[in-house]
Structure formats: C-alpha cells, structure tokens
C-alpha cells in the first residue's frame, strides 16, 4: 500500500521496524556535488556527493557511491597534490552478519568499510614501515596527521578516505592540527558527550560502526560514556621486540622511542621524533583495560538496534582526538571480500569486485512495504532514519521547522541550531512524523520513529 501525504495530514501512525542497514545511508536526493578548498575559495566539483543508490535483497545491501563527501575537502597541508575524485564504488554489505574465525580477519591496506555518506575508511596503517622492512609499520594517525584536511581525510590517488573518526580537527579540546582555522569543514558529525554517537558506517562484515560515545552498559543502561579501547601503549623505550614477545634480530630493530626519523613522504620531509605510538607495533591489547574487545567493538544495545548488535566504535582519547586503533584492526565477522579491489586483501586497491547477480529492490525510504511521497523534496536530511532515540540533521537546514504527527498535530518546533546538534525523541509515541519548513511552508521530510 502507498500513502500520499498532502500537507502533512496523513491519518495512520505507522509502527515500523527499524532497518538501519537500509535507512542509515545519506542518499543524494538534490544532485549536490562535492566541494573543495582551492586557496581561499570553495570550488564546486562536478561529481555528486553522498550515496547515489541503495539496493537490497534479503541477504545484502548494495551501496553505490562516488566516495565524495558533502562537506568540504582539502587542502592537504603535507603537499598532497591529489583531490577527491569519483570512484564509482559498488559495495556489498551483509544484512545478517555472522561471527568469523577465532582471532578475526586482519584488515589490510585500502578500504575496510564505508561511511553512511559513501566515503571509505582505511585502517591505521599508511603503507610504510621503518626501513621498508615490514616489521615496524607506520601509524597513519601519527605520520599522516599533518596531511589531513579539516575533516581528517585525505586522498590516495583520488580515493578520499578517513583513517580515524570523521569529525573536524576543531571538534576537539586540544586540536592536533590548525587547518580548520582557515579551511573549515563540518565533517560527517560532531561529538556530543551527552548523547549516544550516531551510526556512522558499516564494515565489510556487515557490523555497524558507531562514533565514540555509547551506552555505559551494554544493556543500554547507565547513561552515556566514551567507549575506551583496550589497545594500550606498550611500556618500552627501545623497539627490539614485538607485542607478542617475539625478540627481533638487531637488523630488525626499530628506532628508539623518541629518536628522530625521516618520513618517506612527502619528499623532503623534516625528521620527526618517533614517539611511543608512532608505529602500529607500539600497541598491545590488554584484556579488561577498556570497554571494547580486541576488534574495538562489543555486543550492545544501540539506538538503531534496541535488541542489541555487535558494533565497532571509532575511538577517541579524552581530548576527542582519534585514538588507536581508530576504527578496527581486524574484522570480527565473516568478510564479504568482493568489496576489495585489485590489491592484496583484505583491503585491496581502489575499486571493488562486487557485481549484483541476484534480484534486488531499490531503497527509496520504504519500510516494510510502506512508502511515502512528499510534496516537496528536502534540502536537508535526518539520520539515522528510522530513529529510536536521537535524530540529527545535515544539509541546508531551514531556520525553523514544525513537526507534525500522523493526526496532523504540531508536536514540536525545532531551530536550525538544535537540528544540527541533535534532538531526542525519547518518549515520543511510535509513528511517522513530518517536518514543515516554516520558511517555504513546504512539508519536506518524514521521520520514522519505530
């Protein structure tokens, strides 16, 4: 059945099951393109941003995207000459993830998951190691930090990606870069210590990825807490052993902690101090030292999964700067390996090997066979949607909206500031709500509250 909304006087309050693996994606419904900083000017790109198309079957979600964010990218202060370019991605996300082999499957170079805006994430490595020996691998969060734009992203041969939580540098109590001062970007989301962080993406094993704040207790109780990783810095001053205790031959030693090393890129880079944490092998997992397991995740209740799900968390330190392993060092679940391109996997090159060889439907906002048509497309969007707890908005936010329930009653009035920060729907009756843009008088968006 299909309901046509006129004004916002629709008559049925629909109690709809959440399908976050479908509804979480930020679809490009306005044809907007990406943009980047060139000097002091924002330049409009030709390629569309966000996700272009979402298709699904009973077992998989297929996500089509260019890998271009809506938020501004560039410049890259390390001199990276590349810009974000369209990648024509097709990703395949399992809808019913299964636990993988004991110990998980290590992530490799290249993309390891995809954010809800179609931009990919990488693991902590930057593809280089000390003396090119493949023993002491560089931590991209340290060596590449000076080359990230305000949103903490950068391109590798046009493939724009994030190695760590996709928030802006200045969304921190002690920013590790000042690039946002002159070249601001809102990034994917902002941190809120009082709210559960949003669902920000999916790994290629099908498990969701959240920002760094979750419920203090896995059952959803105890308020909100920062998820603390169990990966800790080792207590070493020389790099002569690996985290598992392996004693290295002298020709495999890394630089002493704090010694000066010259990064391999950019050409002519000045030496930097190889502080503890500069290399992946400076870290070890200490059971019980944090709230997350060795995959940087846990099984817990989340707003989108009220019955609980295994989920990864993009971890930050107490200053809200990215903290190793940033996303996840290995997959807990069975990995859909067609998501990796031509390079070694998991990880691979820039593309994917995904093809659709089954019957699929196109996601248009339908839930359980019910779809809605509005009389005006929205220039802004809500996420997550469906939403159980806190709803946030992005895009071109109106100065104020009124929210109507299924009986046509105005139940709330929200400002642009409040919409950007997030609004709690806790205690609201389940149903479908409509936003009316008071500037244009148009009813532009549905919020599904199961």
Could you describe each region identified by the protein language model?
Residues 207, 212, 221-344, 365:
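Extended, compositionally biased non-globular segments
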Residues 1-4, 450:
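Positively charged n-region of N-terminal signal peptides that target proteins for export
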Residues 19-149:
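Solvent-exposed N-terminal domain segments of exported/luminal and surface proteins
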Residues 13-17:
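N-terminal signal peptide c-region/cleavage motif recognized by signal peptidases
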């Amino acid at each position: 059945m299909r309901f046509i909304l006129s004004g916002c006087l629709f008559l049925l309050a629909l109690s709809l099951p959440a399908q976050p693996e479908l509804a979480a994606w930020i679809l490009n419904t306005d044809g907007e393109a990406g943009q980047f900083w060139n000097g002091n000017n924002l330049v409009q790109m030709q390629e569309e941003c966000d996700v272009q198309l979402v298709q699904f079957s009973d077992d998989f979600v297929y996500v089509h995207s260019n890998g271009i964010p809506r938020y501004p990218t560039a410049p890259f202060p390390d001199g990276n000459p590349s810009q974000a370019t369209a990648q024509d991605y097709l990703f395949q996300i399992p809808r019913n993830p299964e636990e993988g082999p004991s110990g998980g499957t290590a992530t490799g170079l290249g993309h390891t998951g995809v954010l809800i805006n179609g931009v990919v994430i990488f693991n902590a490595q930057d593809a280089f190691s000390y003396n090119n020996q493949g023993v002491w691998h560089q931590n991209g969060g340290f060596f590449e930090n000076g080359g990230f734009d305000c949103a903490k992203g950068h391109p590798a041969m046009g493939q724009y990606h994030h190695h760590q939580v996709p928030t802006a540098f200045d969304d921190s109590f002690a920013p590790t870069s000042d690039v946002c001062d002159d070249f601001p970007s809102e990034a994917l989301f902002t941190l809120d210590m009082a709210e559960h962080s949003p669902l920000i993406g999916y790994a290629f094993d099908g498990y969701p990825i959240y920002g760094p704040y979750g419920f203090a207790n896995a059952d959803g109780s105890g308020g909100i807490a920062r998820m603390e990783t169990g990966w800790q810095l080792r207590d070493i001053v020389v790099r002569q052993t690996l985290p598992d205790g392996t004693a290295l031959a002298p020709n495999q030693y890394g630089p002493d902690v704090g010694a000066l090393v010259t990064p391999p890129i950019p050409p002519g880079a000045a030496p930097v101090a190889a502080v503890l944490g500069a290399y992946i092998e400076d870290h070890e997992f200490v059971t019980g030292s944090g709230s997350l397991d060795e995959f940087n995740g846990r099984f817990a209740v989340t707003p989108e999964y009220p019955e609980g799900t295994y989920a990864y968390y993009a971890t930050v330190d107490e200053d809200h700067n990215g903290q190793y392993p940033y996303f996840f060092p290995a997959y807990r679940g069975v990995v859909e390996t067609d998501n990796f391109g031509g390079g070694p996997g998991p990880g691979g090159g820039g593309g994917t090997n995904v093809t659709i060889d089954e019957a699929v439907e196109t996601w248009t906002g339908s839930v359980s066979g019910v779809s809605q048509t509005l009389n005006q497309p929205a220039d802004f969007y809500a996420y997550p949607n469906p939403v159980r707890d806190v709803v946030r908005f992005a895009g071109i936010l109106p100065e104020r909206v009124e929210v109507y329930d299924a009986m046509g009653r105005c139940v709330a009035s929200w400002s642009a500031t409040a919409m950007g920060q997030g609004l709690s729907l806790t205690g609201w009756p389940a149903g479908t709500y409509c936003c009316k843009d008071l500037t244009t008088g148009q009813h532009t968006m549905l919020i599904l509250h199961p």
